[in-house]
Amino acid sequence: MADDDTVKGLAVEAESSRTDDTELTPQEQRRVIRRVDARLIVMLGFLHTVSLIDRGNLSTAAVAGMEKELHLQGNQYNVIAVVFFPPYICLQMLGPVLIRKLGPKLFLAGICFIWGVSMMCGGFVHNWAQLAGIRIIIGALEAGFFPAAVYLIATWYTRYQMQKRFAIFYLLGCVASAFTGFLSYGITFMNGLGGLTAWRWIFVIQGLITCTLAAISYFVLINFPDRMRSSKSRFLSHREYDFITDQINADRGDVRLEPFNLKKYLVAALDINIWGFGLVYFCTTTTAYSIAYFLPLIYREGMGFSMGASLCLFAPPYVAAGITMFATSWIGDKYRIRGPIIVFNAMLALIGLPLMTFTKGNGPRLVGCFLTTMGANSNVPAAMAYQANNVRGQWKRAACSAIFVGLGASGGMVGSLVFRSQDAPEYRPGMLTCIGMQAAAIVLVGLLTIRLYLRNCRVDRGELVIGDLPGFRYTY
């Protein structure tokens, strides 16, 4: 937990505020934050929706006949799923740099539009190798989105406004992408239209949706707060921009962007805390991606549901996850805690995974699907806030976002590999891997809590200054 004096009165939600400096009333402050939320969080949430859909629609396409038409054998499905991740991981560090150089409108809208076109091309492949190639291209393009979006969000808010925003950002994508099961089921009725089978239409239509949202985002997204203040934008008044920048400077003192220095950018990798936060995220995404990629197959092969039921049952666990995600994020921001939230969510998954693995009958296994989806996905914004709250400095924040998301993508690669076709219908090795990952996340949070607590004690004794900002304390 961080020292309250460091951030006292900064969150708009708090009763006290810096109205004496900004000349904004509390009501005006809340209105400013809501306007930023609407233009930034909601738009990024919709872009995140299509990114999740476009990387995770393999399972719905497989259920809709892709495996049969492309004559997939052995681990070819796993290969198609996993080739997304090497470029996605290797190119993470470029996203935060390029969004600063090109601006959010051009960079985020541009890569989103191109990967949408690539997704549409997936509807016209003739073999699994061509589809794998398209997945590589999509992985390279999506690599820039998530770390850049996380970095952009973190520059607009104080530390104890972040988790709710990260939750909304991820929740929109999580819940909306879950309902693609219904969309995919509807698309299956287009089977044969225009000479394309149902699974091909899934790729074409979802790619078209991506391109449309990318075009809209170009006109909606806002720039970094330090750039918006000096631009001709009428989105906020100068007084309102001053409120935003003043509260961030008082919270962590890093509104001003330092000149880019490659050495300083890369030296962030030497901070052991960043790797600890990233490993928590790695454990989280291993389970979250596993569920996203294989839940429809588990429904159909493991529980015996029909194709339509398997696609439609994909959504309800994610709706429950969205509720859990926002509730735990609200608690985390209100009480300024991070680690306990992650432990609670991991425990939900640790209850759900054994129910999915070791019980008989669809009732207990469905309960397990809900608990696992709730716990794993709720920990995504929790882990993001855990990392973002404990980093200061613009370029360090940018580098740490890339490392953090890269480790999360590595978890996705593991999740796509451990559920092997030869292990169907129970997928026990994959389930056991996810159980181990959730247990490891709890252990990592415990170790990080001890480390951050001890370093805060050194700050209290005047022995340490964190991030060159006197009075800054870690949040745990």
Per-region residue spans from a language model:
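Extracytoplasmic gate region of multi-pass secondary transporters
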Residues: 59-60, 263-329, 384, 416
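Helix-to-loop junctions at the C-terminal end of transmembrane segments
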Residues: 90-103, 323-337
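Residue-level signature of mid-helix packing/kink "hotspots" within the transmembrane helices
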Residues: 56, 85-93, 143, 177-178, ...
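Helix-breaking motifs and short loop linkers at transmembrane-helix boundaries and internal kinks
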Residues: 54, 70-71, 94, 102-103, ...
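Central mid-sequence intracellular linker of multi-pass
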Residues: 159-173, 192-270, 429, 434-471, ...
